[in-house]
Every structure is written in structure tokens, then in C-alpha cells.
């Protein structure tokens, strides 16, 4: 193996740049050249590929987003399009690939491995929704961003004795909502994985005000319901003032936390180690605080298991 490529795909996540840096410098330290591929699989097919050096990744570890840029490119599911990507890999002398992203990115990595190009996937997703890893790159930063926003929302909620329904990211996974809900002392957490009773939530909020509380916070994962609709449903059972707030894409931005920078660096170096061993079609993770890897194919049949003890804990603490 003389040269590897690296790309970021799908939704961006803080810490991706730290992973790119680790992959690049670990490979270079082992005598392997590195090519950056801009705009994910779309850039691969278009041949938007350039040589990277240690200087290329300097001063990037602290930056959010991905300096290689990203793009959603569902066309890569098609065999004909994959072969165009393979042509570009051959043209640029790339022997293996590191892909940073989520589920769709992993599908692309598996396709390339089946075409004879070893590819290793790193879990880059703020949702923390990828199986066989306790944490994904970007999750911790997203949680801290959401926590800081909700802390500020609590200030104005208290001033006006209001309830705020705060929508956080997590289409199919409630991990951000659970972690942030506990961290901000939310009155209720609503996630896709657990049933909820909106009347019960309203009653608990009313009881809180009756007991002297000056605010109410409901943390709602985006995959459950639109925040404004949830707020309107809540008001059918409560005589309090309520507002909805959608945090949205701010959760994807910002300088990555220490935890995300370290995790991304460890995973990036580990991915290169696997490629040096001639391995491909693998997904890197961290389980019980140890780096691990699994066949990408296994991930598609598995389901991420969140720490649902946090959901139960918050119910107890919110009483």
C-alpha cells in the first residue's frame, strides 16, 4: 500500500477535521502518501482529489465542520457510478480509503471494498446512531452546544414563567435528547424509542408550577414530532404559557470538544493501522472505552442501543 485516500460524507460533525488530521499524519509517519477527496463520494466520482501533506492538516484540529467538505450523493448506490469512482482511484494511484460519516457513507465504503479497494469507516455523526460504538465523532460537541443553548433558554423561561419545548437533533435516535435532558434538568425527555403520554407531561408541568417552579423544559428529539405541533398538543392539557424552540443545525457546528478531538484522533490513527494490516470493509468504534472494529456488513443488521437508563433517571430526577 503506497497511497490512501480520505473523504467525509453525509452530514458533517465536529471532530471530522481532527480525524482527517490523524489519518493523514499517521499514514505519512508510516511512509504512506495521502490524498484528500473533496465533497465525499460526489467528489470521488468527479475526480476532485489532491495530495495532502502534514501542513495541509495543520491548524485544523480545532475547527468544526470538515475542510474536505461533504455532500450527500445517493447516486453512488448505482454500480455504474461506483465504477466511475474506481476509475478515479486507479487514476490517482489510491490503494485504500478512509471514509468518515454515517450509515450511507458506510454503504459506499463496503461497495468499494467489494470492488477490491480496502475501505475503513469512521463514525462521524452527531446523532450517535451508529451500532457497535458507544460514541460517534461529533456527538459530545453537539450535546454541549445543545446544553449551552438550553441553559440560556432556561433563563428567559424563568423570567416569564414559561414552558419551552426544545427540539434537538436525532431523527431515529434519542441520545442527544437523553444526555442533554439530564444535563439541563429537563422536566421531560421525549424520544423516538420510548412511548410518551403528552397529557401526563402537561400534568407534571402544571404540578411543577404549583410547587413553585418558575419554568418548564421539555427536550424533544426531532424524530418524534414537530416542536410547534408538540407545544400545541401540550397546551390542550395545560393552562401555562409555552413556546417552541428548534436548535437545528447549530448542533453540527462549532469547535469540537476535547472529548471529540481525542476520540477522532484515536479512531483516525486506528483506521490507518487496520489498512496497514491489509484489512478493509471495517467500521471503527469505541466500546467500553476501547477501540474496536467490526465488519461493516454487520452494522446494517444491527441497531444502536442508547443508554436508556438516562431516560429513566431523568423521570426520577424531574419529580
Curated annotation (Swiss-Prot):
Q: What coarse category fits the chief subcellular location reported for this protein?
A: cytoplasm
Task: List the pathway annotation.
Answer: Carbohydrate degradation; glycolysis; D-glyceraldehyde 3-phosphate and glycerone phosphate from D-glucose: step 3/4
Q: Which residues bind ATP?
A: 11, 72-73, 102-105
Residues at the catalytic site: 127 (proton acceptor)
Q: Which Gene3D superfamilies match?
A: 3.40.50.450, Phosphofructokinase domain
Give the CC-aspect GO terms.
Answer: 6-phosphofructokinase complex
GO terms for biological process, alphabetical = canonical glycolysis; fructose 1,6-bisphosphate metabolic process; fructose 6-phosphate metabolic process
How this chain assembles, per its entry, is: Homotetramer.
Protein name per UniProt:
ATP-dependent 6-phosphofructokinase
Q: How is its activity regulated?
A: Allosterically activated by ADP and other diphosphonucleosides, and allosterically inhibited by phosphoenolpyruvate.
Tell me what gene encodes this: pfkA
Q: Which UniProt keywords apply?
A: Allosteric enzyme, ATP-binding, Cytoplasm, Glycolysis, Kinase, Magnesium, Metal-binding, Nucleotide-binding, Transferase
Q: What does this protein do?
A: Catalyzes the phosphorylation of D-fructose 6-phosphate to fructose 1,6-bisphosphate by ATP, the first committing step of glycolysis.
Q: Which family does it belong to?
A: Belongs to the phosphofructokinase type A (PFKA) family. ATP-dependent PFK group I subfamily. Prokaryotic clade 'B1' sub-subfamily.
Which major enzyme category is it? transferase
Q: Which CDD domains match?
A: Bacterial_PFK
KW Transferase (keyword) present: yes
Q: Which HAMAP family match?
A: Phosphofructokinase_I_B1 (MF_00339)
Q: SUPFAM superfamilies given for it?
A: Phosphofructokinase (SSF53784)
Binding residues for substrate, per the UniProt record? 125-127, 162, 169-171, 222, 243, 249-252
* Location relative to the cell: Cytoplasm
For this UniProt entry, the molecular function terms from Gene Ontology, in alphabetical order, are:
6-phosphofructokinase activity; AMP binding; ATP binding; fructose-6-phosphate binding; identical protein binding; metal ion binding; monosaccharide binding
Indicate which residues the UniProt annotation says bind Mg(2+).
103
State which Enzyme Commission number(s) the record gives.
2.7.1.11
